[in-house]
């Protein structure tokens, strides 16, 4: 089968950084689906892996952890899907990526594709949707449909991929007051259109921006970018016993700043379940199906950016 891979970590402008190659067709394990890949999306994780992980023994490493396609075959213990089903998923970083004609993935982290979307639009969703969903409902433990009086969520980086889904989930499915951050007129308008109640400028001190907007503090924070830069401001902005969740990789955080207010810190990494094969892996299947229902109902919208055409090393 055709695939896109790399053999050594090189700058992306190097002609050998990514190569079109031929690989044997993968074989589905007992809980696996063999998927004919129709579309993939590119995420920061692709760049991080390519820059930091060199394949061993001259092997080719295939990237790609957001995909949509059609089930070609199923493993002996598969119960959730059948051949011909349209699916979407983010896969596992412990296995080969989906930048290939065929791909194997555990059924427990796969969802039925939204009926109203094409493959490219669907492939843009899984990683960001899983991250946003787990952060909101599992790490921050926000309940659907209600929130205690005065509860609020500050989303730092609300116009990005995860932020765009998170803003929609929080505004559509909870009673939280949603405050997003954006620094340009275009992104401010985007975040407002996604349902944020307030939009503040993250190029300015966040606690001061909140006060100017009439929001002296917040009960929850989702820090999606530059957490180390904003950390002191986020601690100041959080109400006592508030919760801070993050997804990025800050170099160092002085968490002793959290003690005085009894603040809690939560990390969200959507690959944890598949990486460690946790007992609740099936939750990602369930949430992807729920996201598909919300997309088809018009409650959520996809965040596909630019379509690059055929899947190959050049693109």
Annotated model-derived regions:
Residues 123-204:
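Mid-domain Rossmann-like dinucleotide-binding core that forms the NAD(H)/NADP(H) cofactor-binding site
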Residues 24-41, 51-94:
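Glycine-rich beta-strand-centered segment in the early N-terminal region that forms part
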Residues 85-86, 102, 152, 243:
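Residue-level marker of beta-strand positions
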Residues 98-99, 183-190, 252-255:
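Short, glycine/polar-rich helix-capping loops at beta-to-alpha or helix-loop-helix junctions
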Residues 120:
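C-terminal boundary of histidine-terminating zinc-finger modules
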Residues 94-107:
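A structural motif shared across PLP-dependent enzymes of the aminotransferase-like
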Residues 144-146, 194, 198-268:
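Glycine-rich cofactor phosphate-binding loops and adjacent beta1-alpha1 units
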Residues 257-308:
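C-terminal substrate-binding/catalytic core of Rossmann-like NAD(P)-dependent dehydrogenases/reductases
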């Amino acid at each position: 089968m055709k695939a896109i891979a790399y053999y050594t970590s090189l700058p992306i402008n190097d002609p050998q950084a990514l190569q079109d190659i031929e690989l044997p067709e993968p074989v589905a394990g007992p809980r696996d689906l063999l998927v004919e890949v129709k579309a993939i999306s590119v995420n920061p994780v692709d760049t991080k892996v390519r820059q930091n992980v060199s394949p061993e023994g001259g092997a080719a490493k295939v990237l790609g952890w957001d995909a949509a396609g059609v089930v070609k075959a199923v493993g002996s213990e598969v119960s959730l899907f059948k051949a011909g089903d349209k699916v979407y998923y983010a896969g596992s970083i412990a296995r080969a990526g989906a930048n290939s004609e065929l791909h194997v993935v555990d059924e427990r982290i796969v969802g039925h594709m939204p009926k109203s979307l094409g493959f490219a639009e669907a492939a843009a969703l899984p990683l960001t949707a899983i991250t946003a969903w787990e952060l909101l409902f599992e790490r921050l433990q926000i309940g659907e449909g209600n929130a205690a009086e005065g509860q609020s969520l500050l989303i730092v980086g609300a116009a990005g991929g995860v932020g765009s889904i998170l803003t929609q989930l929080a505004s559509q499915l909870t009673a939280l007051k949603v405050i997003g951050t954006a620094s340009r007129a275009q992104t401010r308008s985007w975040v407002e259109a996604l349902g944020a109640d307030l939009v503040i400028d993250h190029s300015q001190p966040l606690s001061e921006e909140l006060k100017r907007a009439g929001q002296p503090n917040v009960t929850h924070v989702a820090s999606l970018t530059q957490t180390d830069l904003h950390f002191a401001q986020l601690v100041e902005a959080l109400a006592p016993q508030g919760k801070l969740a993050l997804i990025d990789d800050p170099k160092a955080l002085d968490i002793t700043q959290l003690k005085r207010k009894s603040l809690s810190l939560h990390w969200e990494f959507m690959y944890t379940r598949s990486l460690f094969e946790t007992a609740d892996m099936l939750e990602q299947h369930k949430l992807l199906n729920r996201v598909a229902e919300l997309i088809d109902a018009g409650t959520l919208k996809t965040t596909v950016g630019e379509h690059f055409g055929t899947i190959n090393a050049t693109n």
